[in-house]
Amino acid sequence: MKAQKGFTLIELMIVVAIIGILAAIAIPQYQDYTARTQVTRAVSEVSALKTAAESAILEGKEIVSSATPKDTQYDIGFTESTLLDGSGKSQIQVTDNQDGTVELVATLGKSSGSAIKGAVITVSRKNDGVWNCKITKTPTAWKPNYAPANCPKS
């Protein structure tokens, strides 16, 4: 008798079934991971502007996100993000009330995942110098674990 070479059909079917089960578990986990990572990155990009905002407040200048600020204004130095709606400096909406309160707002869009697209990140400063972060207007596919601990969904 000749020795068997190769695999039987049932062995191949078992391997395909195992790979299918592993993929069914891994793909949703990976999608959640990428969504969390994108939200965390966007929050970090917006939060990084707090230092520039503090400098503007100390100098008594109005905080703006503009390529051509006036002498009485301070550009926070934001560069374009692939995760936020809009283009260039307009991706960040700045509200400076000139009383020490500031609000930096960005909307997730562009290349961000569909589960997080449209969520709004707001980083705000009270006049006592305390900064807060919150995420609002989340899409229906949003999961609670997407928001980082330092910027909860409200």
UniProtKB/Swiss-Prot annotation:
This is Fimbrial protein. It is found in: Fimbrium; Membrane. Glycans are attached at S154. SUPFAM superfamilies: Pili subunits (SSF54523). Disulfide bonds join C133-C151. Residues 1-6 form a propeptide. Pfam families: N_methyl, Pilin. It is a single-pass membrane protein. Gene3D superfamilies: Glycoprotein, Type 4 Pilin. Belongs to the N-Me-Phe pilin family. InterPro entries: Bac_GSPG_pilin (IPR000983), N_methyl_site (IPR012902), Pilin (IPR001082), Pilin-like (IPR045584), T4P/T2SS_Core (IPR050470). Keywords: Disulfide bond, Fimbrium, Glycoprotein, Membrane, Methylation, Transmembrane, Transmembrane helix. The modification N-methylphenylalanine is found at F7.
